[in-house]
């Protein structure tokens, strides 16, 4: 199995290739100067694989940078249209908590991601050596709410230290996405059109009512 992971939900973009157990990852922060396909070519070269050998593509669905997530989904959809490839979306929150587990954090750990407008996406897990269990589902909290919990909480996430200096900076990575996919006993692949960013806010626009003006004769 050759799995390509694409994680663009945070300021640290990454792609990773797991080719028959050989893993390579390319990361880029901030400027995003390297096109996604250039990053993919890099990991293909490092694993001595070809594009044609990629049979599975995993996408980080966020929440996070809506533009980045949309770009990753568009890449996956285009790849599926061009050839026979299986697609799977995984929450970037799950990738972050998996990395927190790898870094041996234990107890209650909250993933905190910037949601703009002085708000944050937040989900809490109980983490032990054996794994992690969600105890507070992903939801949106205000800055004041997050600050009120900061003294006793273990906060992790991309850019978390901008608001909470005691937090642990942890980014979701494409390598972690591939590991999470391989660890699943059942994988429910989806057609490209079913991949959607995780976005908890209601739609910001309202459809205009039909015009009441009489039609022109």
Feature annotation, model-predicted:
Residues 1-63:
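N-terminal beta-alpha supersecondary unit
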Residues 57-92:
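DPxDG-like acidic metal-binding loop motif
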Residues 34, 38-41, 73, 77, ...:
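N-terminal, well-ordered alpha-helical segments
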Residues 42-44, 85, 107:
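Short, charged/polar low-complexity linear motifs in solvent-exposed/disordered segments
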Residues 1-20, 31-34, 88-217:
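Oxyanion-binding and handling regions
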Residues 45-48, 81, 101-102, 186:
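Residue-level signal for alpha-helix termini/capping positions
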Residues 22, 74-76, 129:
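Glycine-rich, phosphate-binding/catalytic loops in enzymes
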Residues 41-42, 77, 81, 179-183:
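Short glycine/serine- and small hydrophobic-enriched flexible loop segments
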């Amino acid at each position: 199995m050759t799995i390509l992971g694409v994680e663009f939900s945070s300021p640290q973009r990454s792609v990773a290739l797991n080719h028959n157990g050989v893993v390579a990852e390319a990361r880029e922060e901030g400027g995003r100067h390297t096109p996604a396909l250039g990053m993919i070519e890099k990991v293909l070269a490092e694993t001595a694989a070809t594009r044609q050998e990629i049979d599975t593509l995993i996408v980080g669905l966020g929440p996070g940078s809506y533009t980045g997530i949309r770009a990753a989904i568009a890449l996956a959809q285009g790849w599926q249209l061009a050839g026979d490839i299986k697609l799977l979306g995984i929450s970037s929150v799950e990738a972050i908590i998996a990395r927190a587990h790898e870094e041996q954090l234990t107890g209650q750990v909250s993933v905190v991601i910037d949601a703009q407008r002085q708000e944050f996406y937040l989900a809490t897990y109980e983490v032990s050596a054996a794994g992690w269990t969600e105890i507070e589902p992903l939801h949106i909290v205000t800055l004041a709410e997050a600050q009120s919990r900061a003294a006793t909480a273990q906060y992790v996430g991309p850019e978390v230290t901008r608001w909470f200096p005691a937090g642990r900076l942890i980014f979701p990575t494409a390598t972690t996405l591939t590991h999470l996919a391989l660890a699943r006993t059942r994988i429910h692949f989806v057609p490209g059109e079913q991949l959607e960013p995780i976005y908890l806010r209601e739609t910001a626009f309202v459809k205009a009512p039909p015009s009441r003006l009489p039609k022109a004769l």
